[in-house]
Regions:
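Bacterial Sec-dependent N-terminal signal peptides
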Residues: 1-21
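Acidic/His- and Gly-rich active-site-bordering loop/insert found
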Residues: 19-130, 140-157
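Metal-dependent amide/peptide-bond hydrolase catalytic core
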Residues: 20, 68, 249-435
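Soluble non-cytosolic domains of exported or imported proteins
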Residues: 32-36, 49-60, 132, 136, ...
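Divalent metal-coordination and catalytic microenvironments
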Residues: 45, 84, 97, 135, ...
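Short, flexible, mixed-charge acidic loops at enzyme active sites
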Residues: 108-119, 215-219, 393-401
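Histidine/acidic-residue-rich, glycine-tolerant segments that coordinate divalent metal ions
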Residues: 118-130, 136-137, 148-276, 281-285
Length: 435
């Protein structure tokens, strides 16, 4: 009797392994077949970039493609967002895949034959627009994934939600947007999402490689604004003034001591940056006030609270000592939480990443002080966010143009691995979490 049970269990395990191997092989072949389509979509989107909450053409392209596959489509989610819902023929979990759609106000100078020449109005000024962060690749990859999975619908366990998100780089002034707004409008409900996966192109990781980190992988970020009010005077008679420029300068220098002297950096990194100082308009007039804008990046709530407290204390006390005042607003605007990769989920899906790229091409990396609004999804449901190498083979990561710069380049050869990895994550997770 025991021997029979063991044989049955062994047969079941072998059958499951064979089925898993079969769909992985089919996904790999499908990745080969769809690669040129994905590249063509990427070129089209790259040549026609759109800023946050204005991704009308991109959304229309996505919508038509999903509808052609017979996928249920919801439009205008979070202003310009598109959500596709693919129901497999077998019961299983609800798995979300996310791609962001927006471009940046950057003039492209990398010489690509499909480089952007688009110009638009941004903050009242005409500006060039460029996909300088790889979001064109994200969209093209997820469009490819949708086509592959739609073709495997009869074998698909559960439901896949394709989330095409606007405004990851931030909504226009005075508007809500991005993942925050999509979550607010219920993108993770109806049907309720069990788990979410996201990827990001990386121009300084070689094509064919994936990188990941369990736990806090990207920093939480919150902006701050400090308004220093002093007393104006003629520049020739500074003794009649309380100089807000001098006070602001002292505050900037003192803020840099927070990370080096107050944060336990052996546990987690943190960053305090002042990115803008505005005050005065003539060389011989000491102005009445100065405004400063900056941001804080941290990986724990404790560090964030500490840094905010010290910013307020330093600004107010420095100003008071000089006879000025400092109004501190923090967080100022939308605050992004830490992008946290669920540790159990990350460990569970690591073999899938390794299967997709090859064991030797998947790398554990340190936490990154960049920020991502994927964090709003991962706050609500278990999430895994990983990076997809986009640097041409043979290039030096130290000299590869970074994200958000005019020379930024992502190699077309990178996208097939993105398609394969997303598809494998869906099938492997569904296989391990049958309902």
């Amino acid at each position: 009797m025991k021997k029979s049970i063991i044989i049955v269990l062994l047969f079941g395990f072998q059958l499951a392994s064979a089925q898993k191997s079969n769909y992985s092989e089919l996904i790999a072949k499908s990745g080969d077949k769809i690669e040129q389509k994905v590249i063509a979509w990427r070129h089209d989107i790259h040549q026609n970039p759109e800023l946050g909450n204005r991704e009308f053409r991109t959304a229309e392209l996505i919508t038509k493609h999903l509808q052609s596959l017979g996928i249920e489509v919801q439009t205008k989610v979070g202003i310009t967002g598109v959500v596709g819902i693919l129901k497999g023929d077998k019961p299983g979990p609800v798995i979300a895949l996310r791609a962001d759609m927006d471009a940046l106000p950057v003039e492209e100078t990398n010489g690509l034959p499909f480089a952007s020449k688009v110009k638009t109005m941004y903050n009242g000024k005409e500006t060039s627009v460029m996909h300088a962060c790889g979001h064109d690749g994200h969209v093209a990859v997820l469009m490819g994934v949708a086509e592959v999975l739609a073709g495997m619908k009869k074998d698909l366990k559960g439901t896949v939600k394709f989330i095409f998100q606007p405004a990851e780089e931030g909504a226009p002034i005075g508007e809500e947007g991005g993942a925050y707004l999509m979550v607010k409008e219920g993108v993770l409900e109806n049907p309720k999402v069990d788990v979410i996966f996201g990827l990001h192109m990386d121009s300084q990781v070689e094509v064919g490689n994936l990188t990941y980190r369990p736990g806090g992988t990207l920093a939480g970020v919150g902006d701050f604004k400090i308004t220093v009010k002093g007393k104006p005077s003629h520049g020739s008679k500074p003794w009649f003034s309380v100089d807000p420029i001098l006070v602001a300068s002292q505050i900037v220098v003192s803020l840099q001591q927070i990370v080096s002297r107050n944060v336990k950096i052996t546990d987690n990194a943190a960053v305090v940056t002042v990115g803008a100082i505005n005050g005065g308009n003539r060389s011989n007039i000491i102005p009445a006030q100065v405004e400063m804008l900056g941001d804080v990046r941290a990986f724990t709530n404790e560090d964030e609270t500490l840094i905010y407290s010290r910013i307020k204390q330093i600004a107010e006390k420095t100003a008071e000592a000089a006879g000025a005042t400092a109004l501190v607003e923090l967080p100022y605007g939308v605050k992004y939480p830490v992008t946290f990769n669920n540790i159990e989920l990350t460990n569970l899906m690591l073999p899938t990443l390794q299967k997709s790229a090859g064991v030797g091409n998947v790398f554990l990396v340190p936490a990154n002080t960049g920020a991502e609004d994927f964090s709003f999804y991962a706050q609500k449901v278990p999430g895994l966010f990983f990076r997809l190498g986009g640097m041409p083979k043979g290039k030096d990561a130290k000299t590869a143009p970074p994200h958000h710069t005019p020379e930024f380049i992502i190699d077309d050869a990178s996208f097939k691995l993105g398609v394969i990895t997303f598809c494998n994550l869906v099938f492997d997770y569904a296989e391990m979490n049958k309902k």
